[in-house]
């Protein structure tokens, strides 16, 4: 890929827009599905839970989540208007259980202690003020709630050709340090590895990633 194409890819991974964004959203759903399902598993969803996902993409995984327990209520938020529209389109049959909210990326527009479970996959690289954002998540999570944060490890991510463009990368120690600066203190680290098709579409690669299960 040419440098300009890599920049466009990086921009659309952060905030998918238009027809290219829809294409990237489909690709992200496919390549991130393993990480997403591991994150959902780590949530240990229970009947009646109110769940928030930060950065829902095209939302094709929501059906899987809603099937895991009874009377779940899911809200997904995203900065991408394109993904917001696609997620609503892909989940019309779950309108009574799933809601999608467009937001500006920094202030989480919810009341204190709203959610039992919160999760996010591959978004932390784009947070402008990570500690403030973590504290915002802490604020809207109920006492004894669970927050799952999943990210590609630095030593894997830095080999990808598009991550030099506006990606902030972390290894496990750096992420632990970041979280320790927030109100969150209790966490469990689980390292994973999977083989996926690269986002440039040119090869299959082994991705190393971390699922952090953080309790309030």
Regions found by a protein language model. Name each.
Residues 106-117:
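A short acidic, Gly/Pro-enriched loop at the edge of an enzyme's catalytic core
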Residues 195-216:
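Core SAM-dependent methyltransferase catalytic element
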Residues 117-130:
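A short SAM/SAH-binding and catalytic strip from SAM-dependent methyltransferases
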Residues 158-174:
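Acceptor-substrate binding/catalytic loop of class I
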Residues 50-107:
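Class I SAM-dependent methyltransferase SAM/SAH-binding core
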Residues 131-143:
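A short glycine-rich, Lys/Arg-flanked "PGG" loop and its adjoining helix->strand segment in the class I
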Residues 30-47:
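Conserved alpha-helix/loop element of class I SAM-dependent methyltransferases that forms part
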Residues 145-151:
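Conserved beta-strand signature within the Rossmann-like core of class I S-adenosyl-L-methionine
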């Amino acid at each position: 890929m040419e440098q300009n194409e890599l920049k466009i890819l990086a921009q659309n991974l952060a905030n998918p827009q238009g027809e290219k964004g829809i294409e990237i959203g489909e690709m992200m759903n496919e390549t991130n599905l393993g990480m997403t399902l591991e994150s959902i598993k780590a949530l240990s969803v229970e009947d009646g839970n109110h769940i928030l996902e930060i950065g829902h993409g095209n939302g094709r995984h929501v059906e899987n989540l809603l099937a895991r327990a009874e009377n779940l209520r899911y809200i997904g938020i995203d900065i991408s208007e394109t993904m917001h529209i696609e997620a609503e389109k892909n989940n019309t049959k779950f309108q009574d259980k799933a809601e999608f909210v467009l937001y500006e990326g920094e202030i989480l527009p919810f009341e204190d202690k709203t959610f039992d479970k919160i999760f996010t996959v591959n978004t932390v690289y784009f947070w402008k003020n990570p500690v403030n954002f973590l504290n915002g998540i802490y604020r809207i999570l109920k006492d004894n709630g669970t927050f799952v944060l999943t990210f590609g490890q630095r030593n894997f991510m830095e080999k990808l050709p598009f991550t030099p463009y506006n990606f902030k990368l972390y290894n496990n120690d750096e992420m632990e340090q970041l979280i320790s600066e927030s109100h969150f203190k209790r966490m469990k680290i689980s390292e994973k590895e999977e083989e996926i098709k690269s986002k440039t579409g040119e090869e299959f690669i082994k991705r190393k990633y971390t699922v952090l299960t953080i309790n309030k």
